[in-house]
Amino acid sequence: MEALYTDDQIFIPIISDYGFKATFGNEANTLFLRKALQALIKSDTPIKEVKFDKNTFEGVTKDGRSGIFDLACTDENGNHFIVEMQYGNAPNFVQRMKFYSLHKFNAVVKKGKFDYSILEKIYCVGILANNINTYEHFHNVSNLRNEQGELIDDQMTFVTVELDKFTLQEVDCQTDLQKLIYTMRTIHTVTQPTQFPQFWNEEWLKVAIDELDSRKMTPDEKASLEILIARNAESVKAESKKIKEARESENLVVKTEMVINAISMGLTVEQCAKLANVSSDFVLSVQRQLSAN
């Protein structure tokens, strides 16, 4: 799923850095965030208000490293929500969610002076562009359960959404969760108002869509967006370079092993080079390293 904004798009992708902050992180109007959170945790109880928390924590590891998540807030009942949007590949994303949640859990326990009977609930929500689970469902809610699947504790809840697994069409979207994920997957592809689904007229989604409409942005907002686009492009370029270098390094290791094996078999320099698809100089370099060792 493409999350980077381009000049020909009318609507900014929600999963982009700017889009996430403009919708989920909209402190001036929290309607979208409240409805989205209610849908994501599958609650029948409306969230009336939210208060944004500091979204970093410092000095929690021995070497001073700190964690950072995209959004942290608390509702009117003291329930805590942590939301992170992940665009790139993150095979260990669940471990990161546990790290965030357990840090919050420790803070809640200390705040309650270790009275475990009054702990507020913690919901850690991870929204991912790519897949990390083997399950077929795009939305998963996880609690502590026994081997029979019976609930042991729901004080801490983990929610994962994998956008790539969502395949419902507009006409199939009936629940707020389905409407939310459909919007996140498609809003940046819309070029004409006639393409709007009927449910995009619902107030909570209109609030978010208006924030994503590049035509309604102030000059300052457009300037901020351009800065983020430049940063995103640079990040993508840097990440691509790292991936390329890693692949080249891995390829070099494989070729070196092939040359070493070929040398041990008594093949000539030319034969080793042809077998490993490398130059004769490369083979000679490996030979010198072997001799030195």
Question: Where are the regions that the model predicts?
Answer:
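Conserved single-residue anchors adjacent to enzymatic active/cofactor-binding motifs
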Residues: 1-220
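Short, charged alpha-helical interaction segments and adjacent helix-coil junctions
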Residues: 1-9, 18, 81-86, 182-293
